[in-house]
């Protein structure tokens, strides 16, 4: 502490002694007194309707050429969606869409997505039994691509390319399906593949090589090698 004589001397010189203030103890006390819950964000509790999945709806557009197959196979589509997935399904005649909705009996969170993939696979041209695998198995996927994205073709060149993908009597397509354990649908210039991730990759590689002009014999050899490597890996 400065004495009175030193303070008077500093006052005469015109300078003021600055004392260092210690705020460490005060800051510690302020932090201890602070309420950690004061700045917490309070969220309202989730509604029971959202937990039960009410109100979720999916619409799948049905192309015109699939109206008759949908009508003929409606019972096969209706049964697994309602009995196994516990969903509500109907065909809206006005919008030409298949509407799938959850209800109180719906238990599985992914049931709505499985049913939507199942119906979409059927509308793309897959058989009901093949599309039903999307409901039973979780590791199956659906992939589509356009031949024009691989190689731009027009007119007769596009028709010959699609013919190479199918083969005589569908032999090439069936061979690729059997080797890669997938299902393939050729719809105009669109190609739809149903299977597991690795198998879809093998089938897509074979189809793209055919589009690019490789002979089927070389494509078969490459495809069998890739399929054997996938089999050894798993």
Swiss-Prot record:
Entry GO MF terms: RNA binding
Annotated segments matching region Disordered: 1-39
Highest taxon in the source lineage: Eukaryota
Compartment(s) of residence: Nucleus, Nucleolus
SUPFAM superfamilies documented for this protein: Eukaryotic type KH-domain (KH-domain type I)
A Pfam family it matches: KH_KRR1_1st
Keywords: Nucleus, RNA-binding
Keyword RNA-binding attached: yes
GO biological process: ribosome biogenesis
Any Gene Ontology CC annotation: nucleolus
Domain KH: 158-207
Family, similarity comment: Belongs to the PNO1 family.
Protein name: RNA-binding protein pno1
Biological classification of the source: Eukaryota, Metazoa, Ecdysozoa, Arthropoda, Chelicerata
